[in-house]
């Protein structure tokens, strides 16, 4: 009988490029590919250690002199909606949720383009065409859903979230919505609705991506109770956002080789840095 040993994930580091969150900073990412057998287990394990997924790549910040970007997740059991968040839920009661397999549609792309053009025209995704959008949605080696929110009155697609289903929660990979409805707080609404989905499914967490102190576009995440950030190799409740700073320092981040050595992988594999 022949046994095939699991292939150890290879970890790489991107070249530095301008940080999209903090002006004047440079970002760098540590990443690996999701391929072969065991991708679900690898995705689950690394998501619990601050990694995020983009198509078939898992990555997390590994900046040389800055550690401001921290993965964030909401503990469903510890979440209590504020009065404002309850109003947001009520304001969007006319939206119907539908979770589908990861398949891109023309309606999704039209909404996606409208969202980018009006909210993130200078962002790194601003030039994505329909084929690149389809790849973002459909090229997933793990269990992924497209969660669509449709207006019951007009039948218009109003918001979309590309969501991964993990063993311990839901990961909101990317979300977008009608930019002409700021009063509806659709971004906040989708997070609130995912908390409810996770609660109904018995999943303890909703992963939100990164929280960055000092970044205005990321500040809304700190408004959710039960928020935890991945800091110093462990998940820490964010009780006082002001206690975290975005200051940079050459000793803020451990050497890449040390970061890779400390990554915990599914049983039977060990990380390798290339």
UniProtKB/Swiss-Prot annotation:
Annotated catalysed reactions: N-terminal L-glutamyl-[protein] + L-leucyl-tRNA(Leu) = N-terminal L-leucyl-L-glutamyl-[protein] + tRNA(Leu) + H(+); N-terminal L-aspartyl-[protein] + L-leucyl-tRNA(Leu) = N-terminal L-leucyl-L-aspartyl-[protein] + tRNA(Leu) + H(+)
Subcellular localization: Cytoplasm
InterPro entries assigned to the protein according to its UniProt record, in alphabetical order: Acyl_CoA_acyltransferase, Asp_Glu_LeuTrfase, N-end_Aminoacyl_Trfase, N-end_Aminoacyl_Trfase_C, N-end_Aminoacyl_Trfase_N
SUPFAM superfamilies attached to this UniProt entry: Acyl-CoA N-acyltransferases (Nat)
Keywords associated with the record: Acyltransferase, Cytoplasm, Transferase
Pfam families in the cross-refs: ATE_C, ATE_N
EC main group: transferase
Tree of life domain: Bacteria
GO cellular component: cytoplasm
UniProt-recorded Gene Ontology molecular function terms: arginyl-tRNA--protein transferase activity; leucyl-tRNA--protein transferase activity
An individual GO BP term: ubiquitin-dependent protein catabolic process via the N-end rule pathway
EC number: 2.3.2.29
Chain segments annotated as coiled-coil in the UniProt record: none
Role played: Functions in the N-end rule pathway of protein degradation where it conjugates Leu from its aminoacyl-tRNA to the N-termini of proteins containing an N-terminal aspartate or glutamate.
Family, similarity comment: Belongs to the R-transferase family. Bpt subfamily.
Name of the protein this chain belongs to: Aspartate/glutamate leucyltransferase
Source organism (scientific name): Ruegeria sp. (strain TM1040) (Silicibacter sp.)
Gene name of the record: bpt
């Amino acid at each position: 009988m022949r046994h095939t040993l699991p292939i150890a994930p290879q970890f790489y580091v991107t070249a530095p490029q301008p940080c999209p969150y903090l002006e004047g900073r440079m970002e760098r990412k540590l990443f690996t590919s999701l391929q072969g057998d065991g991708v679900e287990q690898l995705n689950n394990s690394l998501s619990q250690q601050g990694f995020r997924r983009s198509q078939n790549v898992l990555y997390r910040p590994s900046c040389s002199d800055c550690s401001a970007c921290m993965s964030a997740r909401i503990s469903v059991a510890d979440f209590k909606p504020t009065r404002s968040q309850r109003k947001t839920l009520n304001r969007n009661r006319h939206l119907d949720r539908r979770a589908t397999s990861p398949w891109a549609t023309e309606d999704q792309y039209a909404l996606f383009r409208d969202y980018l053009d009006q909210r993130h025209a200078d962002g790194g995704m601003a030039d994505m065409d329909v084929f690149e959008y389809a790849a973002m949605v459909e090229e997933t080696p793990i269990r992924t859903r497209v969660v669509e929110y449709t207006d019951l009155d007009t039948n218009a697609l109003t918001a979309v979230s590309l969501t991964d289903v993990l063993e311990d929660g839901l990961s909101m990979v990317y979300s977008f919505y009608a930019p002409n409805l700021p009063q509806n707080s659709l971004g906040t609404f989708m997070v609130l609705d995912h908390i409810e989905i996770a609660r109904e499914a018995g999943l303890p967490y909703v992963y939100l991506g990164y929280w960055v102190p000092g970044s205005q576009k990321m500040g809304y995440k700190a408004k959710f109770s039960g928020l935890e950030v991945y800091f110093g190799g462990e998940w820490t409740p964010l009780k006082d956002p002001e206690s975290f700073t975005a200051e940079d320092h050459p000793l803020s981040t451990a050497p890449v080789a040390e970061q890779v050595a400390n990554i915990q992988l599914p049983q039977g594999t060990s990380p390798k840095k290339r």
